[in-house]
């Protein structure tokens, strides 16, 4: 007779299985396991008296004959494509298997071979996600990298040169000299990186020069002058050289209105930053651009989600970031024109409908680099509380909503910037950039971060203790973030033109450089679970937002999960 075990005992031993449900941290979000790829009775688990031992769950297979370098056992995967329980095999820094790990000589259904050269990471009782991707980084200080990594973000794209006044306001690394220096600085940083050149020019020569120098995209920012002429010139260069264009539009409507910007874009693919407008953009109606099929709309996290504190904190942030003077009435009026409770409230709902597709930080330039994933799932929680279950979900779980929101910080930014062949999801062949979470800390504090197959960050106790767990336990960098282990675990994203110019040799780079690809053919329809195209309008007097004729409004949150309950400061 087979041995029978209660569901509770099974979950405590091997993690949850099909039909089990998990509450995520202190949110109201419920996840349900859709499928279990492990085999009952043949599960693998490491430890004294456990399964991964010689002749049992561990085979004699050497690495050269197919054994993996690392197995993550019994992990609960949350990704845009599904919520499944599986073992995950890693080899040469990449994901090579999602299924059943073990010894094919003694176990049934093995698709991931464990051998003497295999390391084990216990995933049972944990949630596994792809490393987060933040595509709105002001590279103001290198300390942002550690803060982002500690939050579960493993890829950062944006612009800047350090705490220069231009960088404090705009996500641009202007010119070949600065792009080269930032590519060299990336050598010592344990995340994937890509840098945007300045896109504000009316003629192509200086833009092409930056792309050849290693820019993986171009950024149009109103502080440098985002006019119809610069928009057209920048997109024309991008179309020829296959890089993405990101845009922060003209808040003051000096060179035109949102309709003029849409006309200048001419149906070409473009990534619109902080599309609601508080972070900058045509006042008061830039938000309507999210209904365009060629527009990839994102939010930055200071407006995620709408709370009773959102409006109050924005004015001071604006004055500092954009080099404004509170003693000049016109500067104050400029700042105040960007802050509208009506459009911020509508932004929450447009995310829940899948019309806004991406969430990023706007690091140290009105946004918080370590809160991208936190703010994303705070928004999901708020929308469940205020709007109830999505039509695709049931009373049992919020699976569709969870897939929609995880896509906003993983696969969709990867698709938008031409890097989805390498990162953005848990799929075979992709870089093993993975984040392991305890369910009680999901979205706020990762337990372990794997970068290119090596552990780069983990919750760790006192280094002088006799075991790893005594306090103080906090996130610390691990071996994968040090020495020569760093370079092979990370990618630097550049243009194809930079690869053709052999930028790696020119600058003496040790990290692998990868060209972004297919950035000009991606439209909103390609973005996973976030491709809705409502017809959006804004009342110019009241700022009320309508989607397909329906008023979009919600109350600000008075209290949020994933907040002070988890943080001492």
UniProtKB/Swiss-Prot annotation:
Its EC number is 3.5.1.5. Residues 131-569 form the Urease domain. Keywords: Cytoplasm, Hydrolase, Metal-binding, Nickel. This is Urease subunit alpha. Heterotrimer of UreA (gamma), UreB (beta) and UreC (alpha) subunits. Three heterotrimers associate to form the active enzyme. The gene is ureC. It is found in: Cytoplasm. It comes from Synechococcus sp. (strain CC9605). Substrate binds at residue 221. Ni(2+) 2 binds at residues 219, 248, 274. Belongs to the metallo-dependent hydrolases superfamily. Urease alpha subunit family.
């Amino acid at each position: 007779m087979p041995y029978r075990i209660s569901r509770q005992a099974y979950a405590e031993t091997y993690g949850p299985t099909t039909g089990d449900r998990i509450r995520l941290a202190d949110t109201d979000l419920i996840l349900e396991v859709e499928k279990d790829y492990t085999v009952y009775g043949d599960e693998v688990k490491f430890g004294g008296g456990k399964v991964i031992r010689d002749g049992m769950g561990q085979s004699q297979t050497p690495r050269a004959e197919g054994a993996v370098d690392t197995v993550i056992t019994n992990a609960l995967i949350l990704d845009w494509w599904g919520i499944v329980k599986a073992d995950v095999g890693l080899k040469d820094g990449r994901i090579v298997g999602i299924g059943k790990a073990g010894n094919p000589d003694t176990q049934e259904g093995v698709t991931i071979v464990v051998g003497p050269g295999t390391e084990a990471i216990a995933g049972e009782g944990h949630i596994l996600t792809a490393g987060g991707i933040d595509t709105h980084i002001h590279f103001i200080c290198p300390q942002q990298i550690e803060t982002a990594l500690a939050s579960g973000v493993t890829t950062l794209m944006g612009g800047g040169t350090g705490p220069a006044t231009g960088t404090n306001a705009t996500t641009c690394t202007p010119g070949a000299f600065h792009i080269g220096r930032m590519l060299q600085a990336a050598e010592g940083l344990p995340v994937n990186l890509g840098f945007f050149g300045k896109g504000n020019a009316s003629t192509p020569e200086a833009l092409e020069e930056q792309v050849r120098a290693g820019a993986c995209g171009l950024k149009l920012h109103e502080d440098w002058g985002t006019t119809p002429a610069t928009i057209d010139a920048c997109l024309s260069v991008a179309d020829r050289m296959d890089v993405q264009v990101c845009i922060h539009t003209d808040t003051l409507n000096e060179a035109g209105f949102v309709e003029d910007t849409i006309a200048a874009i001419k149906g070409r693919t473009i990534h619109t930053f902080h599309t609601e407008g508080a972070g900058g953009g045509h006042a008061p109606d830039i938000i309507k651009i999210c209904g365009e099929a060629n527009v990839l709309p994102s939010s930055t996290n200071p407006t995620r989600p709408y709370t009773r504190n959102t409006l109050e904190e924005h004015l001071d942030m604006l004055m500092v970031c954009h080099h404004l003077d509170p003693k000049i009435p016109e500067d104050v009026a400029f700042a105040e024109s960007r802050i509208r409770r009506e459009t911020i409230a509508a932004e929450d709902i447009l995310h829940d409908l899948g019309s806004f597709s991406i969430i990023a930080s706007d690091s140290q330039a009105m946004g918080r680099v370590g809160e991208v994933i936190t703010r994303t799932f705070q928004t999901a929680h708020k929308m469940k509380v205020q709007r109830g279950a999505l039509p695709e979900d049931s009373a049992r779980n919020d699976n569709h909503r969870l897939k929609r929101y995880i896509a906003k910080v993983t696969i969709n930014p990867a698709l938008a910037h031409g890097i989805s062949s390498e990162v953005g999801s848990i799929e075979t062949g992709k870089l093993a950039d993975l984040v392991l979470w305890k369910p009680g800390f999901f979205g706020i504090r990762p337990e372990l971060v794997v970068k290119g197959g090596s552990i780069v960050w983990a919750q760790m106790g006192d280094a002088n203790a006799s075991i790893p767990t005594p306090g103080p336990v906090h996130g610390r960098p691990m071996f994968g973030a040090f020495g020569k282990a760093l370079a092979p675990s990370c990618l630097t994203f550049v243009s194809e033109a930079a690869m053709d110019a052999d930028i790696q040799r020119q600058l003496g780079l040790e990290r692998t450089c990868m060209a972004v690809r297919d950035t000009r053919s991606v439209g909103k329809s390609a973005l996973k679970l976030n491709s809705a195209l409502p017809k959006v309008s804004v009342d110019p007097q009241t700022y009320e937002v309508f989607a397909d004729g329906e008023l979009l409004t919600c109350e600000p949150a008075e209290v949020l999960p994933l907040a002070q309950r988890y943080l001492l400061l």
